[in-house]
Amino acid sequence: MDKAVYPVAAYAFLALFVLATVFELFFAFKERTLYRKMVKPWCVLFLTVFAIVFLPNWHGALIMLGAFLGCVGDTLLLKKGHQRYFIAGAISFLFGHYCYIAAMLLYASPSLAPIHYIAFGLTFFVLIASLIVPTMKITKSKGVGAAGALYLSSLIMVPLIAFVLLGVTGQNYFLMIGLGGLSFLCSDCYLAKTRFIKHDRREDFYIMGTYLLAQFLIVFGLLLCFA
């Protein structure tokens, strides 16, 4: 496994991520929408650059791609009230989750047997089947509901796989990744609630707080696995 490098530049971008996150959450709490939107795309972008500088190999590139797709999703979701941007953003996040899942399985592959992959696949399809009716009812659309079931199932698979791999490999960093996956799940479920059911005051503060925590835990946990 390649050794990670830790140049000053990597920690500089991590510091920029933290700084941008502080500003983002401050503006979200104060409900300064314009300023919050100006800062939002930069948060995960700094985390993306941190990933590839911290681990400049193809493992780092895969993790970076997952974070970058999150950054693209962040930018697309700035267009509130536009269905096509919302769908495009969700697709970007979806493939970002798949990058994270691929990175986890890649790391754990020496410890996995075929039965593990079969179990993951069956669990994924059971989740889709069990969620498709509720998501259709919430979104009041068959197409959006079906897509929502696919997205939510993929999102659930991130912490589920992480916790399974924690037990299989004994790698403690999977606990960090699993907690990040749960935080991502909280963020997106609350986002769906505010979009399809009821808006809340300071909703962006809670959405972005859990989301940025999730991205950090997942990305940094994966980087440390391969370091």
Model-flagged regions — what are they?
Residues 1-227:
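Polytopic alpha-helical membrane-helix bundles and their juxtamembrane interface segments
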